[in-house]
Amino acid sequence: MKAIIQRVTRASVTVGEEQISSIGRGLCVLLGISVEDTQKDVDYMVRKILNLRVFEDENGRAWSRSVMDGELEVLCVSQFTLQCLLKGNKPDYHAAMPAELAQPFYNNMLEQLRETYKPELIKDGQFGAKMQVLIQNDGPVTIQLESPPAPTDPKLLSKQEKQQQRKEKTRSKGPSDSSREKAAQRSKVDPSASSGAEGDVSSEREP
């Protein structure tokens, strides 16, 4: 999931001739949902949007307060073009989640924002509509966010599984098991360590 977050003095969304949403001071969030996004990506973005410290405090100290600290507004606008991949000069949007899946996913994120913050301070555009978005950037301050990708490389997944198995195996071993393994490794490195000891024993048995 990708987001372009802008600190604004005001922002609004117009569809046709009707202004359907507007905010004063706060954040305008353009949100691009990927076909690979899950609830973990929603949780990450909600947490970051609401806690990002891009506002000054009462003493004028910059980068000190979040939108929640100042009880400011948030305007979210669905923006599938953030998932663009260029093929030459032509944008390709196959990485974006299809609209029929993205709309409930987006609505779920809005609901989570409202549950975490004050619902009356979370505004949005109109999903799938052709919108005119007016953004009066304050600063300007523009921050690009991207949720951490889940590991999809089979080699990376296999490596992580092996590392986890080694950790579990180490935890389950007793001290004696570990000591025996170390002794076995030493004997492989220095074969004379074991053969010499056996020779001493046999020589004691000879008359």
Curated annotation (Swiss-Prot):
Region described as Disordered: 142-207
Alphabetized CDD domains for the sequence: Dtyr_deacylase
Entry EC number(s): 3.1.1.96
Keyword Cytoplasm set for record: yes
Motif position, Gly-cisPro motif, important for rejection of L-amino acids: 139-140
Matches recorded under InterPro entries: Daa-tRNA_deacyls_DTD (IPR003732), DTD-like_sf (IPR023509)
Keywords: Cytoplasm, Hydrolase, RNA-binding, tRNA-binding
Gene3D superfamilies tied to this protein: D-tyrosyl-tRNA(Tyr) deacylase
Main location per the UniProt record: cytoplasm
Function of the molecule: D-aminoacyl-tRNA deacylase, with no observable activity on tRNAs charged with their cognate L-amino acid. Hydrolyzes correctly charged, achiral, glycyl-tRNA(Gly). Deacylates mischarged D.melanogaster and E.coli glycyl-tRNA(Ala), protecting cells against glycine mischarging by AlaRS. Acts via tRNA-based rather than protein-based catalysis; rejects L-amino acids rather than detecting D-amino acids in the active site.
Subunit structure: Homodimer.
Protein name: D-aminoacyl-tRNA deacylase 1
Record organism: Danio rerio
